[in-house]
């Protein structure tokens, strides 16, 4: 079976982004988002989802991190959606509960063709390194919207903001790895399409 791949670019007055990914990868990554902590989160996402990701972003981070973070989530969601094609054979659902030291995150995803985000996490710090924590939820919202997926993310408990954010990215990565897995040759929907 050929590997499922995608390439997406997005150029606006605020950002210039290119992504190439392989769903059936090994978790190899080359990430240059312009936001160091986001690089770390996307590297973790790639490694634990086993999705190979090459991403570059030139953005107006001198203004703030909003445009780059939002647009990166848009291209990531679009690229995964493109690589999934008609979603024939995918498991469709995935879930994970992942610890990161004292923090525990739960993620569930349905690659349903419908966008929805449930997000329940509170961060005690306004930033982690150069990432605004208010943008964590917005990243996942934009990802869900452009992936056309239901995503549920929760911090069940935790104290350290870095650990909470990383646990969210890792739990979604593991859930995604399960959801994109090929398990049959049919579309997992009574409608016949996803």
From Swiss-Prot:
Record protein name field: Imidazoleglycerol-phosphate dehydratase
Keywords from the named record: Amino-acid biosynthesis, Cytoplasm, Histidine biosynthesis, Lyase
Phylogenetic lineage: Bacteria, Pseudomonadati, Chlorobiota, Chlorobiia, Chlorobiales
Catalytic activity: D-erythro-1-(imidazol-4-yl)glycerol 3-phosphate = 3-(imidazol-4-yl)-2-oxopropyl phosphate + H2O
Classification via Gene3D superfamilies: Imidazole glycerol phosphate dehydratase, domain 1 (3.30.230.40)
An MF annotation (GO) of this entry: imidazoleglycerol-phosphate dehydratase activity
Pathway: Amino-acid biosynthesis; L-histidine biosynthesis; L-histidine from 5-phospho-alpha-D-ribose 1-diphosphate: step 6/9
Single GO biological process annotation from the record: L-histidine biosynthetic process
Pfam families: IGPD (PF00475)
Enzyme class: lyase
The organism of origin for this protein: Chloroherpeton thalassium (strain ATCC 35110 / GB-78)
